[in-house]
Amino acid sequence: MTGASVADHTGRPIRVGLDVGGTKIDAVAVDPSGEIVGRLRRVTGWGDDAVVESIVAAVSALADEVGLPSSDIGSVGIGIPGLVDADAGRVDHAVNLGVESLELADRAEQALGIPFRVENDVKAAALGAAALSGVTGSMAYLNLGTGVAAGIVIDGRIWRGSRGTAGEVGHLSVDPNGRLCGCGQHGCVETFCGGGALAKAWGRPGALPIRDIFDAADAGDPLALALCTDLFHGAAAAVRVLVLSADVETVVIGGGLTALGDRLDGGIRAALHAGAEASPFMRSLRLDERIELLPAGSPAAAFGAALVGASITEKEIVPHG
């Protein structure tokens, strides 16, 4: 990301954050106090050009909603799936968007003349979840959606690791004889608690397979009961790994599966409690008391992208007033 032709927008009142998903963009406008003053959703395009066009359209529409010209936007942050080079503003292998390699920040800056920063979507969501939850120390954001991944925030900053893969707990193999994962391994955490893997294992038609699984489990269906158990134990395994490896104080759980609400929360807590019964050490960690569920529809991912776009050098988290 060169940014050579982008004007200095320091001090401009509005920061924009975009959570770019496979089907939709969730966009928020954030004022200097940290309040969300506008929010909208737009359909995501497919392929390099369409993705850029849909991002530009979302920013312009959001500016209209807030009642400001696009020139009053100080920065735009984008959270997007795939392998992201945050320094270069490039995203690679965003397969659900039809993107193999895209110089996203440069393309968007050329279209709007506004500074753009790009970050992996789950890492951006971790920042947003930390800010919205008021966490000031260490936390992890565990995303339970079609896939499974985590973002880790230590002392207000994203922890990326040496090669940017910190938090990829979905591809930790916990059962070498388990189901085949899309990554090529067997028995990954994602095969237990990822929405896509659960829907595939369920194998029955329906618009909302995860809800169908839970409804069938309530009716005593053996396969559904087994898949619910897999979900709870897989998510519990991810929580254990995050706490034991990074010693985070809190694990905030988000993603599409949080629409299950208390059923998901209670099941994961029960699995954590049961898994610690035989170990005084694990009991001492009180893992079942260290998880929080984001409300369904939370703007955490887009809000975190706005923080990323702000290019805050000392702290990436700002208080949410």
Residue ranges and their predicted role:
Residues 1-75, 85-88, 110-114, 131-137, ...:
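ATP-binding/phosphotransfer module of carbohydrate and carboxylate kinases, centering on a glycine-rich
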Residues 19, 75-81, 119, 141-147, ...:
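Short beta-strand segments
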Residues 36, 91, 158-159:
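Hydrophobic "anchor" residues
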Residues 39-42, 95, 162:
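Short hydrophobic alpha-helix segments
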Residues 43-46, 99, 165-168:
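A short acidic/small-residue loop/turn micro-motif
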Residues 89-100:
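A charged helix-plus-loop insertion that forms the helical arch/lid used to bind
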Residues 112-130, 140-142:
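ATP-dependent carbohydrate kinase catalytic cores
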Residues 137-192:
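Glycine-rich phosphate-binding loop of actin/hexokinase-like ATP-binding domains
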